[in-house]
């Protein structure tokens, strides 16, 4: 991953509503959620949510797919993995025991 992409993704997450949207979509899993449900769940006006979804989408962190009249948004798990790997590359000067708690926490958070 290029530093520029990592900065774009981290910047997209560095706002309260966008971080909440992202976390909600991660929690929703691969089935995702329609934009309307996201707006209701987070109590965000639809026009505000639309702008936030565009920023997250442009950063590659989420994807939207039209299903009938709705757009279903999902977290881009490949992008998330890439960002985590980028952040953890060359971690701890090769001392795996330092990274073990981080990896254990990540595994326990997953389904």
Model-derived features with residue positions:
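N-terminal helix-turn-helix DNA-binding core of bacterial DNA-binding proteins
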Residues: 4-45, 67, 71-79
């Amino acid at each position: 991953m290029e530093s520029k992409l990592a900065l774009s993704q981290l910047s997209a997450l560095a706002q309260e509503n966008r971080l909440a949207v992202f976390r909600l979509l991660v929690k929703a899993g691969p089935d995702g959620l329609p934009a309307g449900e996201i707006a209701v769940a987070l109590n965000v006006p639809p026009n505000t949510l639309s702008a936030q979804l565009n920023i997250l989408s442009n950063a590659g962190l989420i994807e939207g797919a039209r299903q009938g009249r709705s757009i279903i948004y999902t977290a881009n798990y490949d992008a998330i993995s890439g960002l985590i790997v980028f952040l953890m590359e060359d971690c701890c000067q090769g001392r795996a025991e330092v990274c073990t708690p981080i990896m254990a926490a990540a595994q326990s958070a997953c389904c």
